UniProtKB/Swiss-Prot annotation:
<dbReference type="GO" id="GO:0070186">
    <property type="term" value="F:growth hormone activity"/>
</dbReference>
<dbReference type="GO" id="GO:0046872">
    <property type="term" value="F:metal ion binding"/>
</dbReference>
<comment type="similarity">
    <text>Belongs to the somatotropin/prolactin family.</text>
</comment>
<keyword id="KW-0479">Metal-binding</keyword>
<keyword id="KW-0862">Zinc</keyword>
<feature type="signal peptide">
    <location>
        <begin position="1"/>
        <end position="17"/>
    </location>
</feature>
<dbReference type="GO" id="GO:0060396">
    <property type="term" value="P:growth hormone receptor signaling pathway"/>
</dbReference>
<dbReference type="InterPro" id="IPR001400">
    <property type="entry name" value="Somatotropin/Prolactin"/>
</dbReference>
<keyword id="KW-0873">Pyrrolidone carboxylic acid</keyword>
<dbReference type="GO" id="GO:0046427">
    <property type="term" value="P:positive regulation of receptor signaling pathway via JAK-STAT"/>
</dbReference>
<comment type="function">
    <text>Growth hormone plays an important role in growth control and is involved in the regulation of several anabolic processes. Implicated as an osmoregulatory substance important for seawater adaptation.</text>
</comment>
<feature type="binding site">
    <location>
        <position position="186"/>
    </location>
    <ligand>
        <name>Zn(2+)</name>
    </ligand>
</feature>
<protein>
    <recommendedName>
        <fullName>Somatotropin</fullName>
    </recommendedName>
</protein>
<dbReference type="GO" id="GO:0048513">
    <property type="term" value="P:animal organ development"/>
</dbReference>
<feature type="disulfide bond">
    <location>
        <begin position="194"/>
        <end position="202"/>
    </location>
</feature>
<feature type="disulfide bond">
    <location>
        <begin position="69"/>
        <end position="177"/>
    </location>
</feature>
<feature type="modified residue" description="Pyrrolidone carboxylic acid">
    <location>
        <position position="18"/>
    </location>
</feature>
Amino acid sequence: MDRVLLLLSVLTLGVSSQQIIENQRLFSMDATRVQHLHLLAQRLFSDFESSLQTEEQRQLNKIFLQDFCNSDYIISPIDKHETQRSSVLKLLSISYRLVESWEFPSRSLSGGSAPRNQISPKLSELKMGILLLIRANQDAAEIFPDNSALQLAPYGNYYQSLSGEESLRRTYELLACFKKDMHKVETYLTVAKCRLSPEANCTL
C-alpha cells in the first residue's frame, strides 16, 4: 500500500512539473510577443511625434491627457499594488481583453511600412497565446468564460473620413493608446509569469 501511495505521489509530482514547465514555456512565448509589440508601439509613436511641429505635439499631448482610451472601460488594476495582489487568471483575462480591444482599431495602424504590417498578425498570435494560458490556469473556483470579454465600441471617428487636423489627432490617439495598452499587457504578463515561480520576487 505504501509503495502504491509513493508511486502515485511521484506520478502526481511529475505531471505537476510538466504543467509548470509548459506554463513557463507559454508565458515566455507571450512575453516575447508583447515585448515586440510594445517596442514597436513605442517606435511608431516616437516616429509620429518626430514628424510633428513642436506646437502640434504640445496641443495633441494636451488633448490626449484630457481624453480616454477606449480600453479604459476595461476594469483593470489601478496601481502596481493592486496588480501584484491580482490573481494570475485575472491578469490573464484583463490582458486578453486589452489585446482583443485592438483587433479592429489596429487595422488603421497597418500599411505603409513592414513594421506596421506586423501589428495585426502579432496581436492575433498574442491573443491566442493568452487564451491558451487562461485555459491552462482555469479552475473550478475561478472561471472566466470565453464570452466574458467586454465588447467595446470602435473609436468614435474610426469609420469616418476626417480632415487633416482631425486625422492627425486620431492617429496620435491610436498610437498613444496602443503604446499604453501594450505596456499594461506586458506588465500583467510579467507579474502573472512571476507568480508561478515561487522563488521569484514579483515586486514591480
